[in-house]
Amino acid sequence: MGYTEVAAAPPSMAAPPDPQFVLRGTQSAVHALHFCGGAQEQGHQLLLSGSLSGLVHIWSLQTRRAIATLDGHGGQCVIWLQTLPQGHQLLSQGRDLKLCLWDLAEGRNAVVDSVGLESVGFCRGSILARGQQRWMLAVPGRGSDEIQILEMPSKTSVCTLKPEADAKPGMPMCLELWQTDSSPRPCLLAGYEDGSVALWDVSERKVCSRIACHTEPVMGLDFDSQKARGVSGSAEKALAVWSLDEQQALQVRGTHELTNAGISDVKIRPDRKILATAGWDHRVRVFHWRTMKPLAVLAFHSAVVHCVAFAADGLLAAGSKDHRISIWSLYPRS
């Protein structure tokens, strides 16, 4: 079953809105975005952005200004940001082969720890909370096709995931750690350079399933663990939708043709109603998650959109090479 996007907007696709507001001031391409509840801002929501210049900006969505700037990556691009379960700690991953742990409590902005990385690629890390104080971290490993799993904050190596001897998937490009409610066993979804997506059983260090989703490197993926369904984008002109059955087998459910090639990032909204893609064609595209029906094409940016992020309340942020971050309120959560 294939989904096909028509060239013209379908009658049900209303004229796209303008951004609710725009954040300016990074003075550099925006490569990473992450929303967090504001420990610093008396409960107000904050947006974190990582830029090509190596800086992390912390934005107040109330004042629409940066309230702090973190400089921990020696001028090298920041490609991933993630707050930890307790809220006031932040992980930032840069192309300086370093993952920094920041303490943001009470207005602090100090690096309290760091992890040396083995790979300089653009593969963002992933975490899985193991209670309030511990979490599992997946990052690209030393070998070009390897993934390293660490227990944090102890930095203890759990294992290295190496592809099967006969598989040649190339480099991991994107990672997603998760676990089902019914099982404590952590799983990892990895998108690879050859266009495949693999499901790893981390405890067993083995690939449960691998599917060919794309003919180009997988640039972004997201997974809906409640529906056991995921979506991925690549350098080509299609999104792939795939599912996971009870036997841990991945299956491609359909492909959705895009108007233009190249997806940098894809995110499913927390309520699992819609998803957004960041496009090389300067566009953010919004789809209905269950049907993959196109809902909106957001044409605000003047250069590649590198990243998208959803807040818990449904607000959407997009970061671009044009140095701007656009904030959108779409299809309010019911």
Which residues are covered by each model-predicted region?
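Blade-level signature of beta-propeller repeat domains, shared across WD40, Kelch, NHL, RCC1
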Residues: 306-334
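WD40/WD-repeat beta-propeller blade-loop signature
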Residues: 19, 29, 43, 66, ...
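A structural motif specific to WD40 beta-propellers
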Residues: 18-20, 65-68, 110-112, 158-159, ...
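WD40-repeat beta-propellers
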Residues: 56-60, 99-104, 147-151, 197-201, ...
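A short helix->beta-strand "capping" segment at the edge of beta-propeller domains
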Residues: 3-28, 63
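WD40/WD-repeat beta-propeller blade N-cap
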Residues: 23-30, 71-78, 115-122, 163-172, ...
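Loop/turn segments within WD40 beta-propeller blades
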Residues: 33-44, 81-87, 126-134, 175-185, ...
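Conserved strand-to-loop turn within each blade of WD40 beta-propeller repeats
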Residues: 50-53, 93-96, 140-143, 191-194, ...
